[in-house]
Amino acid sequence: EEMMASPLIKTAEDIKQNRTFPNVDGIKFLTHDGGCGCDRGDSDTLCNLLAGYITNPNVAGATILSLGCQNAEVKILEAAIAKRDPNFSKPLHILEQQKSKSERHFIEEAVKKTFLGLIEADKVVRKPAPLSKLVLGLECGGSDGFSGISANPALGYASDLIVALGGATVLSEFPELNGVEQELINRCEAPENAEKFASIMRAYSAKAVSIGSGFENNPSPGNIKDGLITDAMKSAGAAKKGGTSLVQDVLDYTERVTKNGLNLLCTPGNDVESTTGLAGSGCNVIAFTTGLGTPTGNPVAPVIKMSSNNALSERMKDIIDFNTGTIITGEDTIQTKGEELLDYIIEVASGNIVPAAVRLEQNDFIPWKRGISL
Protein backbone atom coordinates (compact mmCIF):
# COMPACT_ATOMS: atom_id res chain seq x y z
CA GLU A 1 0.00 0.00 0.00
CA GLU A 2 2.84 2.38 0.79
CA MET A 3 4.36 1.72 -2.61
CA MET A 4 1.04 2.34 -4.34
CA ALA A 5 0.62 5.61 -2.45
CA SER A 6 4.07 6.93 -3.33
CA PRO A 7 4.19 9.82 -5.83
CA LEU A 8 4.80 8.73 -9.42
CA ILE A 9 5.67 12.18 -10.77
CA LYS A 10 9.22 13.20 -10.03
CA THR A 11 10.29 16.83 -10.07
CA ALA A 12 13.64 18.09 -11.30
CA GLU A 13 14.74 18.52 -7.68
CA ASP A 14 13.69 14.95 -6.77
CA ILE A 15 15.82 13.56 -9.57
CA LYS A 16 18.82 15.69 -8.60
CA GLN A 17 18.93 14.66 -4.92
CA ASN A 18 21.52 12.18 -3.63
CA ARG A 19 23.55 12.12 -6.85
CA THR A 20 27.31 11.68 -6.80
CA PHE A 21 27.57 14.24 -9.59
CA PRO A 22 24.73 16.74 -8.95
CA ASN A 23 25.41 18.73 -12.13
CA VAL A 24 25.15 15.67 -14.38
CA ASP A 25 21.65 14.52 -15.30
CA GLY A 26 22.76 11.03 -16.22
CA ILE A 27 24.67 8.67 -18.50
CA LYS A 28 22.92 7.66 -21.71
CA PHE A 29 23.81 4.65 -23.85
CA LEU A 30 23.48 5.13 -27.60
CA THR A 31 23.47 1.78 -29.39
CA HIS A 32 22.96 1.22 -33.11
CA ASP A 33 23.28 -1.44 -35.80
CA GLY A 34 25.33 0.66 -38.23
CA GLY A 35 29.02 1.18 -38.82
CA CYS A 36 29.65 -1.87 -40.98
CA GLY A 37 27.89 -3.91 -43.63
CA CYS A 38 26.54 -0.72 -45.18
CA ASP A 39 27.54 1.60 -47.99
CA ARG A 40 30.11 4.28 -47.18
CA GLY A 41 27.48 6.99 -47.36
CA ASP A 42 25.59 5.49 -44.43
CA SER A 43 28.73 4.96 -42.35
CA ASP A 44 29.78 8.57 -42.94
CA THR A 45 26.26 9.72 -42.06
CA LEU A 46 26.39 7.71 -38.83
CA CYS A 47 29.65 9.43 -37.86
CA ASN A 48 28.12 12.84 -38.61
CA LEU A 49 25.07 11.96 -36.53
CA LEU A 50 27.19 10.82 -33.57
CA ALA A 51 29.28 13.98 -33.90
CA GLY A 52 26.04 15.95 -33.72
CA TYR A 53 25.13 14.24 -30.47
CA ILE A 54 28.58 14.70 -28.95
CA THR A 55 28.57 18.43 -29.80
CA ASN A 56 24.93 18.95 -28.75
CA PRO A 57 24.79 21.61 -25.99
CA ASN A 58 23.02 19.12 -23.69
CA VAL A 59 25.93 16.67 -23.83
CA ALA A 60 28.93 17.15 -21.53
CA GLY A 61 31.20 14.46 -22.97
CA ALA A 62 31.32 10.98 -24.48
CA THR A 63 32.98 7.59 -24.29
CA ILE A 64 33.10 5.90 -27.71
CA LEU A 65 33.31 2.11 -27.89
CA SER A 66 34.61 1.04 -31.29
CA LEU A 67 35.30 -2.41 -32.67
CA GLY A 68 38.19 -1.12 -34.77
CA CYS A 69 37.79 -2.42 -38.32
CA GLN A 70 34.37 -0.99 -39.24
CA ASN A 71 33.49 1.39 -42.07
CA ALA A 72 32.54 4.08 -39.55
CA GLU A 73 36.17 4.73 -38.64
CA VAL A 74 37.20 6.71 -35.59
CA LYS A 75 39.08 9.19 -37.78
CA ILE A 76 35.84 9.98 -39.67
CA LEU A 77 34.07 10.67 -36.38
CA GLU A 78 36.92 12.86 -35.13
CA ALA A 79 36.90 14.85 -38.38
CA ALA A 80 33.13 15.31 -38.13
CA ILE A 81 33.44 16.62 -34.57
CA ALA A 82 36.21 19.04 -35.56
CA LYS A 83 34.14 20.32 -38.49
CA ARG A 84 31.12 21.01 -36.27
CA ASP A 85 33.11 22.54 -33.45
CA PRO A 86 36.73 23.56 -34.21
CA ASN A 87 37.12 24.53 -30.53
CA PHE A 88 35.74 21.24 -29.17
CA SER A 89 37.00 20.68 -25.61
CA LYS A 90 34.55 18.26 -23.97
CA PRO A 91 35.88 15.05 -22.40
CA LEU A 92 36.04 12.51 -25.24
CA HIS A 93 37.42 9.02 -24.70
CA ILE A 94 37.69 6.57 -27.61
CA LEU A 95 38.44 2.88 -27.06
CA GLU A 96 38.91 0.21 -29.72
CA GLN A 97 38.13 -3.35 -28.70
CA GLN A 98 40.53 -4.91 -31.20
CA LYS A 99 43.39 -3.07 -29.48
CA SER A 100 42.35 -4.28 -26.02
CA LYS A 101 43.82 -7.40 -24.37
CA SER A 102 40.40 -8.71 -23.30
CA GLU A 103 36.75 -7.75 -23.31
CA ARG A 104 36.83 -7.39 -19.53
CA HIS A 105 39.76 -4.98 -19.75
CA PHE A 106 37.96 -3.09 -22.52
CA ILE A 107 34.85 -2.57 -20.38
CA GLU A 108 36.88 -1.70 -17.28
CA GLU A 109 38.75 0.99 -19.21
CA ALA A 110 35.47 2.35 -20.55
CA VAL A 111 34.04 2.62 -17.03
CA LYS A 112 37.20 4.32 -15.72
CA LYS A 113 37.32 6.82 -18.60
CA THR A 114 33.63 7.57 -18.22
CA PHE A 115 34.08 8.22 -14.50
CA LEU A 116 36.90 10.67 -15.24
CA GLY A 117 34.64 12.36 -17.77
CA LEU A 118 31.90 12.68 -15.15
CA ILE A 119 34.31 14.48 -12.82
CA GLU A 120 34.98 17.06 -15.55
CA ALA A 121 31.33 17.30 -16.57
CA ASP A 122 30.24 17.99 -12.99
CA LYS A 123 32.29 21.19 -13.04
CA VAL A 124 29.84 22.67 -15.56
CA VAL A 125 27.09 24.56 -13.72
CA ARG A 126 23.79 25.60 -15.31
CA LYS A 127 23.76 29.34 -16.08
CA PRO A 128 21.14 31.71 -17.49
CA ALA A 129 21.12 31.90 -21.29
CA PRO A 130 19.21 34.01 -23.81
CA LEU A 131 16.44 32.48 -25.94
CA SER A 132 18.74 32.88 -28.93
CA LYS A 133 20.51 29.75 -27.63
CA LEU A 134 17.31 27.70 -27.82
CA VAL A 135 16.96 25.32 -30.78
CA LEU A 136 13.50 23.76 -30.72
CA GLY A 137 12.71 20.66 -32.76
CA LEU A 138 9.17 20.50 -34.20
CA GLU A 139 7.92 16.92 -34.43
CA CYS A 140 4.63 15.04 -34.72
CA GLY A 141 3.64 11.39 -34.58
CA GLY A 142 0.45 9.40 -34.31
CA SER A 143 -1.47 12.34 -35.78
CA ASP A 144 -5.26 12.49 -35.79
CA GLY A 145 -7.94 14.66 -37.34
CA PHE A 146 -7.49 17.26 -34.58
CA SER A 147 -3.69 17.59 -34.85
CA GLY A 148 -3.81 20.13 -37.67
CA ILE A 149 -6.29 22.41 -35.88
CA SER A 150 -5.06 22.28 -32.27
CA ALA A 151 -1.63 20.92 -31.32
CA ASN A 152 0.23 21.71 -34.55
CA PRO A 153 -0.91 25.34 -34.97
CA ALA A 154 -0.37 25.98 -31.24
CA LEU A 155 3.18 24.70 -31.62
CA GLY A 156 3.52 26.81 -34.77
CA TYR A 157 2.48 29.90 -32.82
CA ALA A 158 5.08 29.12 -30.15
CA SER A 159 7.63 28.56 -32.92
CA ASP A 160 6.91 32.02 -34.34
CA LEU A 161 7.36 33.54 -30.86
CA ILE A 162 10.71 31.80 -30.43
CA VAL A 163 11.84 33.03 -33.85
CA ALA A 164 10.73 36.58 -33.00
CA LEU A 165 12.73 36.38 -29.77
CA GLY A 166 15.90 35.34 -31.61
CA GLY A 167 15.79 31.56 -31.23
CA ALA A 168 15.79 28.76 -33.79
CA THR A 169 13.16 26.16 -34.65
CA VAL A 170 13.49 23.10 -36.88
CA LEU A 171 10.69 21.52 -38.94
CA SER A 172 11.49 17.96 -40.06
CA GLU A 173 9.80 14.92 -41.69
CA PHE A 174 10.00 15.83 -45.39
CA PRO A 175 7.58 13.08 -46.57
CA GLU A 176 4.96 14.84 -44.43
CA LEU A 177 5.54 18.13 -46.25
CA ASN A 178 4.48 16.59 -49.57
CA GLY A 179 1.69 18.74 -50.99
CA VAL A 180 2.68 21.93 -49.17
CA GLU A 181 6.08 22.36 -50.83
CA GLN A 182 5.11 25.53 -52.67
CA GLU A 183 4.03 27.30 -49.50
CA LEU A 184 7.39 26.53 -47.88
CA ILE A 185 9.30 27.42 -51.05
CA ASN A 186 7.53 30.79 -51.07
CA ARG A 187 8.62 31.34 -47.47
CA CYS A 188 12.33 30.66 -48.18
CA GLU A 189 14.12 33.98 -47.76
CA ALA A 190 17.05 32.91 -49.97
CA PRO A 191 16.54 31.46 -53.48
CA GLU A 192 19.24 28.84 -52.88
CA ASN A 193 17.26 27.48 -49.93
CA ALA A 194 14.12 27.23 -52.04
CA GLU A 195 16.04 25.26 -54.67
CA LYS A 196 17.72 23.03 -52.09
CA PHE A 197 14.38 22.16 -50.50
CA ALA A 198 12.79 21.40 -53.88
CA SER A 199 15.81 19.34 -54.94
CA ILE A 200 15.82 17.21 -51.77
CA MET A 201 12.07 16.63 -52.06
CA ARG A 202 12.39 15.55 -55.71
CA ALA A 203 15.24 13.16 -54.95
CA TYR A 204 13.48 11.70 -51.90
CA SER A 205 10.24 11.20 -53.83
CA ALA A 206 12.07 9.57 -56.76
CA LYS A 207 13.85 7.15 -54.42
CA ALA A 208 10.55 6.18 -52.81
CA VAL A 209 9.04 5.50 -56.24
CA SER A 210 12.11 3.50 -57.32
CA ILE A 211 11.46 0.93 -54.60
CA GLY A 212 7.79 0.62 -55.48
CA SER A 213 6.37 3.08 -52.95
CA GLY A 214 5.82 6.83 -52.74
CA PHE A 215 4.97 9.68 -50.40
CA GLU A 216 1.29 8.84 -50.85
CA ASN A 217 1.91 5.74 -48.72
CA ASN A 218 3.04 7.78 -45.71
CA PRO A 219 -0.30 7.90 -43.82
CA SER A 220 -0.60 5.00 -41.38
CA PRO A 221 -3.78 2.96 -40.80
CA GLY A 222 -4.30 4.98 -37.62
CA ASN A 223 -3.98 8.28 -39.52
CA ILE A 224 -6.46 7.13 -42.15
CA LYS A 225 -8.96 5.80 -39.62
CA ASP A 226 -8.95 9.18 -37.90
CA GLY A 227 -9.54 11.18 -41.08
CA LEU A 228 -6.06 11.86 -42.54
CA ILE A 229 -6.76 9.81 -45.65
CA THR A 230 -4.09 11.31 -47.95
CA ASP A 231 -0.51 12.46 -47.52
CA ALA A 232 -1.48 15.96 -48.69
CA MET A 233 -4.12 16.22 -45.95
CA LYS A 234 -1.64 14.97 -43.37
CA SER A 235 1.01 17.40 -44.65
CA ALA A 236 -1.35 20.39 -44.50
CA GLY A 237 -1.63 19.86 -40.76
CA ALA A 238 1.97 18.80 -40.15
CA ALA A 239 3.37 21.96 -41.78
CA LYS A 240 1.48 24.12 -39.27
CA LYS A 241 4.12 23.21 -36.67
CA GLY A 242 6.40 25.62 -38.53
CA GLY A 243 4.10 28.59 -37.96
CA THR A 244 4.29 31.45 -40.45
CA SER A 245 7.95 32.48 -40.14
CA LEU A 246 10.24 32.79 -43.13
CA VAL A 247 12.57 29.84 -43.76
CA GLN A 248 16.14 30.84 -42.97
CA ASP A 249 17.91 27.58 -43.85
CA VAL A 250 17.33 24.15 -45.41
CA LEU A 251 19.37 21.26 -44.02
CA ASP A 252 19.93 17.73 -45.23
CA TYR A 253 20.02 14.93 -42.66
CA THR A 254 22.72 15.45 -39.94
CA GLU A 255 23.58 18.98 -41.13
CA ARG A 256 23.95 21.32 -38.16
CA VAL A 257 21.63 24.22 -37.37
CA THR A 258 23.68 27.41 -37.70
CA LYS A 259 21.02 30.06 -38.30
CA ASN A 260 18.39 31.44 -35.97
CA GLY A 261 14.84 31.44 -37.28
CA LEU A 262 12.89 28.63 -38.93
CA ASN A 263 14.95 25.78 -40.43
CA LEU A 264 13.80 22.83 -42.54
CA LEU A 265 15.57 19.51 -41.87
CA CYS A 266 15.27 16.46 -44.11
CA THR A 267 14.33 13.41 -42.05
CA PRO A 268 11.98 10.50 -42.72
CA GLY A 269 8.44 10.47 -41.35
CA ASN A 270 9.28 7.76 -38.82
CA ASP A 271 8.90 9.33 -35.37
CA VAL A 272 12.05 7.97 -33.75
CA GLU A 273 14.28 8.36 -36.81
CA SER A 274 13.14 11.96 -37.16
CA THR A 275 13.53 12.81 -33.47
CA THR A 276 16.98 11.20 -33.55
CA GLY A 277 17.89 13.46 -36.47
CA LEU A 278 16.60 16.62 -34.79
CA ALA A 279 18.87 16.13 -31.76
CA GLY A 280 21.77 15.28 -34.07
CA SER A 281 21.37 18.61 -35.87
CA GLY A 282 21.57 20.55 -32.61
CA CYS A 283 18.06 20.73 -31.13
CA ASN A 284 18.26 21.04 -27.35
CA VAL A 285 14.49 20.69 -26.78
CA ILE A 286 11.92 18.88 -28.94
CA ALA A 287 8.15 19.48 -28.94
CA PHE A 288 6.21 16.45 -30.17
CA THR A 289 2.51 16.66 -31.03
CA THR A 290 0.30 13.57 -31.12
CA GLY A 291 -3.39 12.82 -31.49
CA LEU A 292 -3.35 9.04 -31.17
CA GLY A 293 -0.47 8.72 -28.67
CA THR A 294 3.23 8.05 -29.23
CA PRO A 295 5.42 7.08 -26.24
CA THR A 296 8.86 8.06 -27.47
CA GLY A 297 11.71 10.24 -26.27
CA ASN A 298 15.36 11.02 -26.93
CA PRO A 299 18.59 10.33 -25.01
CA VAL A 300 19.92 13.90 -25.01
CA ALA A 301 17.07 16.30 -25.82
CA PRO A 302 13.97 16.48 -23.59
CA VAL A 303 10.85 15.68 -25.61
CA ILE A 304 7.66 17.54 -24.67
CA LYS A 305 4.64 15.43 -25.61
CA MET A 306 1.58 17.45 -26.67
CA SER A 307 -1.92 15.99 -27.08
CA SER A 308 -4.29 17.33 -29.71
CA ASN A 309 -7.44 16.32 -27.84
CA ASN A 310 -8.72 16.00 -24.27
CA ALA A 311 -9.51 12.29 -24.58
CA LEU A 312 -5.87 11.41 -25.31
CA SER A 313 -4.65 13.64 -22.49
CA GLU A 314 -6.81 11.64 -20.07
CA ARG A 315 -6.24 8.19 -21.58
CA MET A 316 -2.43 8.43 -21.80
CA LYS A 317 -1.76 10.94 -19.04
CA ASP A 318 1.42 9.08 -18.11
CA ILE A 319 3.14 10.22 -21.32
CA ILE A 320 1.40 13.54 -22.11
CA ASP A 321 2.94 16.78 -20.83
CA PHE A 322 0.83 19.48 -22.47
CA ASN A 323 -2.78 19.33 -23.66
CA THR A 324 -4.15 21.46 -26.50
CA GLY A 325 -7.54 19.75 -26.62
CA THR A 326 -9.05 22.80 -24.94
CA ILE A 327 -8.66 24.59 -28.28
CA ILE A 328 -11.14 22.10 -29.77
CA THR A 329 -13.64 22.61 -26.92
CA GLY A 330 -13.37 26.40 -27.23
CA GLU A 331 -11.86 26.97 -23.79
CA ASP A 332 -8.60 28.26 -25.29
CA THR A 333 -7.36 29.77 -28.53
CA ILE A 334 -4.33 28.86 -30.62
CA GLN A 335 -2.71 32.10 -29.44
CA THR A 336 -3.27 31.56 -25.70
CA LYS A 337 -2.13 27.94 -25.88
CA GLY A 338 0.89 28.93 -27.96
CA GLU A 339 1.93 31.49 -25.37
CA GLU A 340 1.40 28.99 -22.56
CA LEU A 341 3.46 26.44 -24.49
CA LEU A 342 6.34 28.90 -24.88
CA ASP A 343 6.46 29.34 -21.10
CA TYR A 344 6.40 25.56 -20.68
CA ILE A 345 9.26 25.09 -23.17
CA ILE A 346 11.37 27.66 -21.32
CA GLU A 347 10.74 25.88 -18.01
CA VAL A 348 11.83 22.57 -19.54
CA ALA A 349 14.93 24.14 -21.09
CA SER A 350 15.74 25.69 -17.70
CA GLY A 351 15.56 22.31 -15.96
CA ASN A 352 12.57 23.29 -13.82
CA ILE A 353 10.16 20.82 -15.45
CA VAL A 354 11.08 17.23 -16.35
CA PRO A 355 8.93 15.90 -19.23
CA ALA A 356 7.38 12.45 -19.00
CA ALA A 357 9.68 10.99 -21.67
CA VAL A 358 12.69 11.91 -19.50
CA ARG A 359 11.16 10.58 -16.30
CA LEU A 360 10.21 7.33 -18.04
CA GLU A 361 13.69 7.07 -19.61
CA GLN A 362 12.35 6.75 -23.14
CA ASN A 363 15.80 7.08 -24.70
CA ASP A 364 15.00 6.10 -28.28
CA PHE A 365 17.83 6.35 -30.82
CA ILE A 366 17.45 5.08 -34.41
CA PRO A 367 19.82 6.48 -37.06
CA TRP A 368 18.33 6.80 -40.55
CA LYS A 369 19.84 4.39 -43.09
CA ARG A 370 19.40 5.72 -46.61
CA GLY A 371 21.42 3.02 -48.33
CA ILE A 372 21.40 -0.77 -48.33
CA SER A 373 23.08 -3.43 -46.24
CA LEU A 374 26.02 -5.04 -48.02
Which sequence ranges carry the predicted segments?
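Metallocofactor- and cofactor-centric catalytic cores in central/energy metabolism, strongly enriched
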Residues: 1-285, 292-374
